[in-house]
């Protein structure tokens, strides 16, 4: 990151040393990676690395030499013992003995995704994230119970389980028709996209990672620097990340010499000739505060209930 003045984001520095200057910088890289690798070191950046992260995934990308109409565009295969499944992912950071998984067949909606008479298949298996953000090996590191994150072994387990589950539930055999396979694992997610601990959804939505606790879309100390993505406000998931991008675009427009935000101005347009200030609804800001207070109370109740239910095991 190229910084200037007091400090202010003034552009970016490329690997070859070239500086691309800018009035403002929007960073869509992984937020934790950005704070710890693209910006000056701070205690806040270090603390971000210690926050709870979301899950990762083992993802298969298969090219099949025939079509399987039994599979629709979107397919979800849930494990019967879902509690054990979640514990393996979020507590042990491993792959469940009976994993749940999602199957997408993009060629159902886009024929160009596969040759005629063939299918393209994407399988996503949620698994735990890397225990150590510095881990570079597919052999991983041991967790607190002593089990090792051996990703090569877990990939084999996942592939075998997926094929067996699909065959038993849909009575089709995919394995013999796979002509090409690519795989992503937590280490490869980390290496390819600099995702901290290989967590594909960034920071988790645990209590101290939501609402006012979640990293802001604008840097607290560096003016002109904004963040979008899963780990910044308001949260993770494509729709929520898009909402965060909308927030950033409004912040930038408002900071640009008071520029108007077109979609806000249009939606809030009123006929000044027939509408006096006394006629306008003034309590909408209060409703917004009430909304956040209710949301906070529900989050506290949910957190307390989760702690109590955990004691029933």
Please place each PLM-identified region on the residue numbering.
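A glycine-rich dinucleotide-binding beta-alpha-beta segment and adjacent secondary-structure elements
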Residues: 98, 102, 163, 167-234
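Hydrophobic, well-ordered secondary-structure elements that form the walls
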Residues: 26, 62, 123, 162, ...
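Active-site-proximal substrate-binding core of FAD-dependent oxidoreductases
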Residues: 3, 252-293
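Terminal signal-anchor or tail-anchor transmembrane helices
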Residues: 282-313
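C-terminal segments that line or cap access tunnels to active or ligand-binding sites in enzymes
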Residues: 63-187
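A conserved FAD-binding loop/helix module that cradles the flavin
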Residues: 230-253
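Mid-domain catalytic core of redox enzymes
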Residues: 1-115
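A generic secondary-structure signal for well-formed alpha-helical elements
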Residues: 29-33, 38, 42, 66, ...
């Amino acid at each position: 990151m190229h910084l200037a003045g007091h400090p202010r984001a003034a552009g970016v520095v490329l690997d070859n040393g070239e500086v691309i200057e800018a009035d403002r910088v929007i960073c869509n890289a992984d937020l934790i990676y950005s704070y710890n690798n693209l910006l000056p070191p701070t205690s806040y950046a270090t603390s971000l690395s210690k926050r709870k992260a979301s899950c990762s995934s083992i993802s298969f990308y298969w090219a099949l030499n025939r079509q399987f109409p039994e599979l629709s565009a979107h397919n979800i295969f849930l494990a019967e013992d879902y509690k054990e499944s979640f514990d393996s992912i979020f507590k042990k950071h491993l792959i469940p003995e009976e994993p749940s998984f999602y199957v997408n067949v993009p060629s159902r909606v886009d024929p160009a995704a596969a040759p005629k008479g063939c299918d393209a298949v994407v399988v996503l298996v949620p698994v735990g994230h890397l225990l150590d953000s510095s881990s570079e090996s597919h052999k991983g590191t041991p967790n607190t119970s002593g089990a090792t994150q051996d990703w090569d072994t877990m990939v084999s387990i996942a592939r075998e389980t997926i094929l067996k589950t699909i065959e038993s539930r849909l009575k089709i055999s995919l394995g013999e028709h796979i002509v090409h396979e690519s795989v992503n694992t937590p280490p490869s997610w980390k290496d390819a996209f600099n995702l901290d601990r290989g967590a594909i959804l960034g920071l988790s939505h645990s209590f101290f990672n939501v609402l006012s606790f979640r990293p802001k879309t604008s840097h607290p100390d560096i003016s002109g620097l904004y963040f979008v993505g899963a780990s910044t406000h308001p949260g993770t998931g494509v729709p929520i990340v898009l909402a965060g991008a909308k927030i950033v675009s409004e912040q930038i427009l408002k900071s640009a010499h008071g520029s108007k935000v077109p979609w806000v101005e249009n939606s809030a347009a009123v006929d000044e000739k027939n509408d006096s200030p006394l006629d306008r609804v003034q309590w909408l800001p209060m409703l917004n505060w009430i909304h956040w207070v209710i949301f906070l109370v529900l989050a506290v109740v949910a957190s307390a209930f989760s702690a109590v239910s955990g004691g029933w095991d």
